Amino acid sequence: MTRKLVLLRHGQSQWNSMNRFTGWVDIGLTEQGHQEATMAGHLMKEEGLEFDVAHTSLLKRAIHTLQDALKALDQDWLPIYKSWRLNERHYGALQGLDKIDTAAKHGEEQVNIWRRSYDIQPPPIDLDDPSHPMRDRRYAALDRKVLPVTESLKNTLERVLPYWNDAIAPQLNDNKTVLISAHGNSLRALYKYLNQESDEKILNVNIPTGIPLLFELSDTLQVVSYRYLGDPDAAQRASEMVANQGKAK
């Protein structure tokens, strides 16, 4: 009997709509983002998914997406676990910048490397930057040394994996059906881990907002199959839109 896991990237955020790097900045959803989250819930309901537990990050765009989706699923009562380890990749000094302007300044190739490569970090924020996570009380209990000032996808995976191993994998091993509402890069990190994707191939993996990605896993949590729910052509188009966000006009 397979275990079921759904990865759901948050719906469109206000900075997604403005094509800005977001990272750990706590930006809310647009109205379209709320609609995407609700539609995701309907797609999961049509699939007949009955979850036992849900996980999300400490950022409201993922939290609100989960709330909207669970409401549409009529599964609002589910236990929800939140962890900073599911936060988006920290984009360092790129956070808040327009992606097209950044591509025009640094070149599309460089921006694509920053956005989609596995082990290359963007420039870091300074320690005295007002947006440094150490100034945010939601991270007050954490050792300052673990708070990022920039991250590559590799760093993000290293951050996410302990939570997978300690919290999520044991639930799947207990035959629980699990929903994770998180972010483009924290989910890309999990996608890479689950599919044993190469460092090169992950460059071309783009996860669209608000479309549930259903994994079926074996009893050893190996991938049996995975697919986006709903129209596969719509998911492909949405993935291509994500890929094009860092291109200069």
UniProtKB/Swiss-Prot annotation:
Domain of life per record: Bacteria
Cross-referenced Pfam families: His_Phos_1
PROSITE patterns: PG_MUTASE
Record has Isomerase as a keyword: yes
Ligand binding (substrate): 9-16, 22-23, 61, 88-91, 99, 115-116, 184-185
GO-annotated biological processes: gluconeogenesis; glycolytic process
Keywords tagged on the record: Gluconeogenesis, Glycolysis, Isomerase
Family: Belongs to the phosphoglycerate mutase family. BPG-dependent PGAM subfamily.
Subunit composition and interactions: Homodimer.
Protein name, entry field: 2,3-bisphosphoglycerate-dependent phosphoglycerate mutase
